[in-house]
Amino acid sequence: EVGTMDERTVITIGREFGSGGHEIGMKLAEKLGIKCYDKELLELAAKESGLCEELFASQDEKPTNSFLYSLVMDTYSLGYTNSYVDMPINHKVFLAQFDAIKKLAERESCVIVGRCADYALEDNPYAVSVFIKASLDERVQRIKRIYELNDSKAADLIQKTDKRRASYYNYYSSKKWGEAKSYN
C-alpha cells in the first residue's frame, strides 16, 4: 500500500503498442493498492469538461496536423480569442485530459497509462515516468494472440498504432515519444 498524501506516488507509463505496458500498469497499480487510469481518464475528463464521451473516444491519442499546440496555447493564453468555445475540438479534448491528469495526481496515488501524462506531470515531484518497450517479435506475437491476426497484419497494426501514438505525443508535448531522455 502507498502511504499518506505526503508520500503520494504517481507513475506514468508510455508504451509501444503490444509491449504489455497497459497490463504492466494494471499489475503495478494492483501491487501498490492504487488505481490505474487509461480509458477511464477519458471518461473522467469528459465528465469534468462537459464534452461528450463519444467525442473523446474519437480524439483518443490522435493528433491533428494543424498548427502547433504551443502556438494554440500562446494564442489562447494571450486572449486573442473570445473563449474556450472557439478552440478546435481536438485541443479541447487534449486540454480536458491534461487538466484531469493534473487533478488526479494532486488527489491520489495512481498509475496513468498513455495520454502524455508524463508531460502533464513533468513538474509534479511525486511523478515518475517510464516507457515500456519490447522487441518487435514479442509485440507481434502478443498482438497476434490478442487480436487473432496473422504476423503481417499484427506488424502493420503495431506500426500504425505506434506512429499514431508518437504523432500525438510529439505534437502535444515538447518531448520525443519513446526517447529515453523524455522519461525518468
State the predicted function of each range.
Residues 123-146, 151-159:
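Conserved phosphate-donor/acceptor-positioning beta-strand/loop module used by diverse small-molecule
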